[in-house]
Amino acid sequence: ISFLALTFFVLAGAIYRFRKRMLHTSLWCLLMLTVGYTTYAVILIRANANTPLNENAPDNIFTLKSYLNREQYESAPLLYGKTYASEPEYVPEGDYYRVKTTKGSAVYRPDKEKGKYKIIRYKEDVCYTQNMLFPRMWNERMAASYKNWTGGSEAAPTQKENLTYFITYQLNYMYWRYFLWNFVGRQNDVQGHGGPEYGNWITGISWLDNVRLGDQKLLPESLRQNKGHNVFYGLPLILGLIGIYWQLVRGKRGKQQFSIVFFLFFMTGLAIVLYLNQTPGQPRERDYAYAGSFYAFAIWIGMGAAGLCDTLRKKKNSVLPISVSMLLCLLIPVQMVL
């Protein structure tokens, strides 16, 4: 706490002392980042209070690292690694064979008598055969579920099936579906697992929704009147796309601004999809994990409204068109609230 307080005051003093624009902005960003990281102090404080529910007991820096890395769960490969059909690699050892492993990171525990941390063991990472580039279908317990999304057999996955799963499930179902919930419309708040009746995105345009999901009027009354049912007719999405276009056509400065917003959009959305490497049958909807990218797209929605007004302002006799465009832009958030 003393270190964080000192860091805060040093950064605040530096911001006051140095008035250069770039340095000033950089220091403010660093200060806000530091303030954000202070929220993790709550985890340490709570763990040291020894509460009845204290998963992983993150009461020191090493157990906190394990807690934040979610090491209680099986780690998913990212760029290269096993598939669900991979087998452990064996090496001879005397008269027997043992599983081949590599030395992993050290596991530390506090030594209260000596007042320091000591290494109690090293983690062992199992080596597998039949590895694959960019492995998306990696969990052996989910072989049947993977095949439900790719339409293949339960044999070793091909790279085509691997990419099919990545696009259809991880990208489309576990990201773009959530994205479209927020900017096009949502069928209901019942968790979906790929079927046509639960948790899909909809537009509110009957013929289009019926082509994708079947006749929505045939759904039970409980689903048609579900409180999570919202239709925006794709208006926020259209306005956001207009905002992207408006930024890109505004020359070098506009492209620079677009790159900043896009970086925020990508790193808080699609990059998380790549990192999590999720398996089918998640216990709950995961839309909350991508909230940052939805905020970023909301910036483009605001840009779209500004772009429409700016375009119409340059035209002669533009009072009426500007008034109409402003009214339409205001109707979009009103529709989202209703």
Positions of the model-derived regions?
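Membrane-interface junctions at the ends of membrane-embedded or membrane-associated helices
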Residues: 12-21, 250-252, 298-321
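Membrane-interfacial loop-to-transmembrane alpha-helix junctions, especially the N-terminal start
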Residues: 22-29, 251-265, 318-325
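Lumenal/periplasmic acceptor-binding loop at the mouth of the active site in multi-pass
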Residues: 47-244
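Transmembrane-helix signature of polytopic, lipid-linked glycan biosynthesis machinery
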Residues: 245-250, 266-284, 336-337
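Membrane-interface catalytic loops of GT-C/OST-like multi-pass glycosylation enzymes that act
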Residues: 1, 46-50, 226-229, 254-257, ...
